[in-house]
C-alpha cells in the first residue's frame, strides 16, 4: 500500500509562487559597451540595485581603470655600466647586448653593454662597411681603450671566431640614468617595448640604417599560393672576416619572414664573397679554431603588415640615418652558426 506524504500548506504556497515567477520574463538591464567608462557605470548601477543597503558608495571593483583592457607587461633588465662605455646620445630603442666574460676572477659587479654603434667600433671594420655608423662611432667612442679596459679579450675572441658566445641580446634601451662614473641601463628583455614609467609609453626599435637590410627584398620568395605570415622576425648576424689581413667581425641586422633554415642558407650565399676571401687569406693557417664563419640570432618580431620607418639621429653637425620599428616585440633567441 502506497502512502502519500501530506505537504504543508505553506510549502505548497511557496511552490506556487516559484512556478508563477518562472512565467515572468527576467528583468533586462541596459549596458553601454561602446566605451569602457559607460560599461563600468552601468555595471555599478546594476550591482547597486541588488547590493545590501548597508554598503555605501560605489563598488570599487568596477572602477574605470579596472574595466580598461590591460597591456602585456614586458620583462625589464637593469645593468650598471661604466659611463665611458655607453654614450649619453645613444637613443632610446637601440638594441643592446651584454658582454660576459664568465665567472672567473676577472668578473666584476659592473656590466659591459654594447650598442650597435659601440659594437661596430670594437669589431674593427672600416668606413666602407657602414660609413655613417663608422663616423659616429669614432665620435662617440673616440678612445677604444675604454672598452679594452672592461673587455680586454674582445680582439682575441674575434680572432678565435667566438665573440658571439659571450654576447647576449638583452633588448631595446628604454632608460639611461647617467652619472659621473656609472650609468644605470634599463632594457626590455622580453615583450612589448614600453617605457618603465606610468602611464607606459611605446618606444620604437632604432637601428643604424647602414647596418640593416630587408632579406625578403634582397632575396624574395618565388610566387606561391602560401598565405602571408602574420609576423616578420628581426635578426642580428656576426660574420668573422679578414680586413687588410686582420681578423675582424662584420655586424648586420635584418628582417625576414623566412624560416630559420632558409635564413642560414641565404646568409651563406649573401656573404659568399667574404667567406671565400677569408679562406683564401688564411690559407694554410685555416684550422678548426678559426673555421667558424659567423652566427645569427633572433632579436624579436613585428607585424608583417607594418613597414619600418626612417629617421635621423643628429649629433652636432653629424647625422646617423636610422631604421625605426614602432611595433617591435623583444623575444631574443640563441645563436646559430652559419
UniProtKB/Swiss-Prot annotation:
First-listed, main subcellular location of the protein, grouped into a coarse class: virion
Pfam families in UniProt: Herpes_VP19C
Top-rank taxon, per record: Viruses
GO cellular component labels: host cell nucleus; viral capsid
Keyword Oxidoreductase part of the UniProt annotation: no
GO process terms (BP): viral capsid assembly
Family that this chain belongs to: Belongs to the herpesviridae TRX1 protein family.
Assembly and binders: Interacts with TRX2, MCP and capsid vertex component 2/CVC2.
Function, as annotated: Structural component of the T=16 icosahedral capsid. The capsid is composed of pentamers and hexamers of major capsid protein/MCP, which are linked together by heterotrimers called triplexes. These triplexes are formed by a single molecule of triplex protein 1/TRX1 and two copies of triplex protein 2/TRX2. Additionally, TRX1 is required for efficient transport of TRX2 to the nucleus, which is the site of capsid assembly.
Entries under HAMAP family matching the protein: HSV_TRX1
Protein name as catalogued: Triplex capsid protein 1
Species per Swiss-Prot/TrEMBL record: Equine herpesvirus 2 (strain 86/87)
Amino acid at each position: 500500500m502506497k502512502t502519500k506524504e501530506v505537504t504543508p500548506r505553506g510549502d505548497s504556497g511557496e511552490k506556487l509562487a516559484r512556478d508563477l515567477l518562472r512565467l515572468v520574463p527576467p528583468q533586462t538591464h541596459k549596458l553601454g559597451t561602446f566605451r569602457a567608462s559607460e560599461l563600468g557605470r552601468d555595471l555599478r548601477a546594476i550591482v547597486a540595485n541588488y547590493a545590501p543597503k548597508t554598503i555605501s558608495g560605489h563598488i570599487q571593483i568596477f572602477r574605470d581603470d579596472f574595466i580598461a583592457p590591460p597591456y602585456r607587461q614586458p620583462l625589464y633588465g637593469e645593468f650598471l655600466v661604466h659611463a665611458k662605455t655607453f654614450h649619453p646620445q645613444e637613443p632610446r630603442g637601440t638594441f643592446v647586448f651584454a658582454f660576459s666574460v664568465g665567472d672567473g676572477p676577472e668578473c666584476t659587479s659592473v656590466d659591459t653593454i654594447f650598442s650597435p654603434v659601440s659594437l661596430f667600433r670594437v669589431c674593427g671594420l672600416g668606413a666602407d662597411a657602414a660609413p655613417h655608423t663608422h663616423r659616429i662611432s669614432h665620435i662617440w667612442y673616440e678612445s677604444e681603450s675604454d672598452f679594452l679596459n672592461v673587455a680586454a679579450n674582445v680582439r682575441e675572441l674575434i680572432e678565435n671566431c667566438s665573440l658571439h658566445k659571450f654576447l647576449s641580446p638583452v633588448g631595446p634601451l628604454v632608460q639611461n640614468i647617467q652619472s659621473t662614473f656609472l650609468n644605470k641601463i634599463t632594457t626590455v628583455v622580453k615583450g612589448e617595448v614600453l617605457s618603465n614609467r606610468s602611464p607606459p609609453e611605446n618606444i620604437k626599435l632604432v637601428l643604424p640604417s647602414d647596418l640593416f637590410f630587408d632579406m625578403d627584398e634582397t632575396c624574395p620568395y618565388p610566387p606561391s599560393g602560401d598565405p602571408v605570415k602574420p609576423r616578420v622576425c628581426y635578426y642580428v648576424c656576426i660574420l668573422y672576416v679578414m680586413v687588410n689581413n686582420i681578423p675582424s667581425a662584420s655586424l648586420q641586422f635584418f628582417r625576414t619572414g623566412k624560416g630559420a633554415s632558409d635564413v642560414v642558407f641565404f646568409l651563406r650565399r649573401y656573404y659568399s664573397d667574404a667567406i671565400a676571401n677569408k679562406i683564401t687569406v688564411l690559407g694554410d693557417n685555416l684550422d678548426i679554431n678559426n673555421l667558424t664563419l659567423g652566427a645569427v640570432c633572433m632579436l624579436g618580431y613585428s607585424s608583417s603588415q607594418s613597414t619600418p620607418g626612417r629617421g635621423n639621429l643628429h649629433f652636432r653637425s653629424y647625422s646617423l640615418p636610422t631604421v625605426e620599428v614602432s611595433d617591435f616585440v623583444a623575444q631574443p633567441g640563441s645563436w646559430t652558426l652559419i
